[in-house]
Amino acid sequence: MLRVRGRSGTKVYIFPSLMRLLLYENLSPKLKKFLSDVYPGTTHVRDVGLHAAQYEDVWRYAAEQGLTIVSKDSDFRQRSFLFGHPPKVVWIRLGNCSTADVEALLRAHHENLITFDQDAQGSFLALG
């Protein structure tokens, strides 16, 4: 359990998630380190040799490894609607933003992501 300060200065407790994320190439590989306290087991496509891979290859890898794809790319959104899960997809809808913005978004929606991960019906979650 982590204790961090919320925006209002109040103490907020965050429990690490068992949810494992696969960060797509349009997100910084640095996010893996930045989010390791709340999303341990997170990896980036570069870490597993999938940099510049076809969407189908990333999709298949995530499904086989039990990972949730996190991307700013709408192609995964479309695949999610067509094929369902696994894998689940989190679509970051922040446009042109910093790595810190993406990190803050994933931290702010930690509880939503855990609920999404545990939802047997949910395949797709849009954030931002």
What are these regions (language model features)?
Residues 1-19:
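Intrinsically disordered, low-complexity and often Lys/Arg-enriched segments
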Residues 22, 49-57, 97-101:
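Residues at secondary-structure transition points
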Residues 79-88:
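Ligand-binding "clamshell"
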